[in-house]
Swiss-Prot record:
Record keywords, A-Z: RNA-binding, Stress response
NCBIfam families hit by this protein: Hfq, PRK00395.1
Organism taxonomic ancestry: Bacteria, Pseudomonadati, Pseudomonadota, Gammaproteobacteria, Oceanospirillales
Cellular component annotations (GO), alphabetically ordered: cytosol
GO biological process, one term: regulation of DNA-templated transcription
CDD domains to which the protein is assigned, alphabetical: Hfq
Function of the molecule: RNA chaperone that binds small regulatory RNA (sRNAs) and mRNAs to facilitate mRNA translational regulation in response to envelope stress, environmental stress and changes in metabolite concentrations. Also binds with high specificity to tRNAs.
Quaternary data: Homohexamer.
UniProt cross-references to InterPro entries, sorted A to Z: Hfq, LSM_dom_sf, Sm
PROSITE patterns, sorted: SM (PS52002)
Protein name per its UniProtKB record: RNA-binding protein Hfq
Gene3D superfamilies referenced in this protein's UniProt entry, alphabetically: 2.30.30.100
GO MF term (any one): RNA binding
Amino acid sequence: MSKGQSLQDPYLNALRKERIPVSIFLVNGIKLQGQIESFDQFVILLKNTVSQMVYKHAISTVVPARNVRIAAQGEGENEASNA
């Protein structure tokens, strides 16, 4: 995993798992709203009344409806080893 992905993937994954509503602003100013259904290296699937595939290169900002807590790197591993 590259350094650029080390924050992005856990952040998007937390938004997806917790089904947090998000507003996604595109570089052209358009605002999209919905929940993150899935994502990969290049796209995000945003679900509202329909699913939209949004290319990451077109995204300016992702704004969650509430605060998101993402696990610090290695935090989940410590919990598993302490069990």
